[in-house]
Amino acid sequence: MDATSIITQVSRDDEQLNVYPSYPNDKDAWLGFSGSVWLPDCPADHAQLTHDVDRLKPQKRGLFHSLLCCWRRNRTKTNQNGTQIDGSTTPPPLPDQQRYLLPQVRLTDMHRKCMVIDLDETLVHSSFKPIPNADFIVPVEIDGTVHQVYVLKRPHVDEFLQKMGELYECVLFTASLAKYADPVADLLDKWNVFRARLFRESCVYYRGNYIKDLNRLGRDLQKIVIVDNSPASYIFHPDNAVPVKSWFDDVTDCELRELIPLFEKLSKVDSVYSVLCNSNQPLNNQTNQQQHPQELQQAPNQLHQQLQQQQQQQTISATTVITQATTLSAPTMLNQQQTSPPSPQSELLQKT
């Protein structure tokens, strides 16, 4: 087993990463499965907030790591709900007692929005290669061998988490394995900000990616915001996302600190869709947020078909005009030249 497969990361030019297996039911990939914005114009009353959001651009992402899900500790603060995903477009229906990934909202969070926060390349960067200035060194046992994972904290992550914990019901949601991500979260979360921790088992495997399906959280979609460096993670719910730049080791990075004013304002609006919209409408139709994921993939195909039809119609029209022009008799063309100034096209015909 490749040790790096326990961490889900995006790639950069100088790093070689593994990719997901071609088939999610591969026994080597699923053995031990434990279960558990591009942001255009928004309403005028959110003009300043929209200005803060517009600078955020989704980053181009590489392929994710290969999977190997292993056991993890049974923690009361870690949510254990979930089910194995067979690679279809949507997760299978869950029994009533396992319907949602998150527990009931605490009284202290009753009037707060839910913030889903990614881990790798959003809050930290981890490597199996020794890093002299690592903030944490986490031992991880893989196939009977203990490996050291070197973890760097993103600049201003402490300030960011502390402030978000005061404003939101915060949930850690990562596509990495719990045996790595859980101890990292223990060291990172000094203030017990994360009300729950969700790992790779809670994701939906769809078209080679692990998707964080916000429908399964058990919270009002209009009151959920996801902070993630990978657009593939929130492909089902792009209107709920605030994309962040992938971070590896830049000590001058200020992304998290600069996002704090945005999230302070976002915590006060009635619906996140009024700001994090991907259309000119202030609030998208709720059914668009809950539509079958396959329809999200079909929409570009329908647009492509419409463009092809338009091109075919233009070709037919152009052919008709050319045919009509060639059927004109010579006297008719001479009469037209006498009654009207010669056109560039007629001059070219005369020269030929």
From Swiss-Prot:
The keyword Signal belongs to this UniProt entry's keyword annotation: no
Annotated spans, Mediates substrate recognition: 103-267
Record keywords: Cell membrane, Hydrolase, Membrane
Region Prion-like domain necessary for both protein assembly and membrane targeting, annotated ranges: 1-102
Domain of life: Eukaryota
Alphabetical list of Pfam families matching this protein: NIF
Record text on activity regulation: Phosphatase activity requires amyloid-like aggregation on the membrane.
InterPro entries for this protein: Dullard_phosphatase (IPR011948), FCP1_dom (IPR004274), HAD-like_sf (IPR036412), HAD_sf (IPR023214), RNA_Pol_CTD_Phosphatase (IPR040078), TIM50 (IPR050365)
Subcellular location: Cell membrane
Stretch list, region Disordered: 284-310, 332-352
Predominant location category: membrane
Gene Ontology MF, one: RNA polymerase II CTD heptapeptide repeat phosphatase activity
Biological process, per Gene Ontology: positive regulation of embryonic development
CDD domains linked: HAD_FCP1-like
Any one cellular-component term (Gene Ontology): plasma membrane
Membrane topology, as annotated: Peripheral membrane protein
Catalytic activity: O-phospho-L-seryl-[protein] + H2O = L-seryl-[protein] + phosphate
PROSITE patterns linked: FCP1
Domain spans labelled FCP1 homology: 108-266
EC number: 3.1.3.16
Stored NCBIfam families: HIF-SF_euk (TIGR02251)
Task of the protein: Prion-like membrane-associated phosphatase. Phosphatase activity depends on amyloid-like assembly at the membrane. Might have a role in establishment of segment polarity in embryos.
Subunit structure: Monomer. Forms higher-order protein aggregates with amyloid-like features during gastrulation. Interacts with babo, dah, Irk1, pch2, Ras64B, sax and Src64B.
The protein's name: Phosphatase Herzog
Source lineage: Eukaryota, Metazoa, Ecdysozoa, Arthropoda, Hexapoda
Recorded name of the encoding gene: hzg
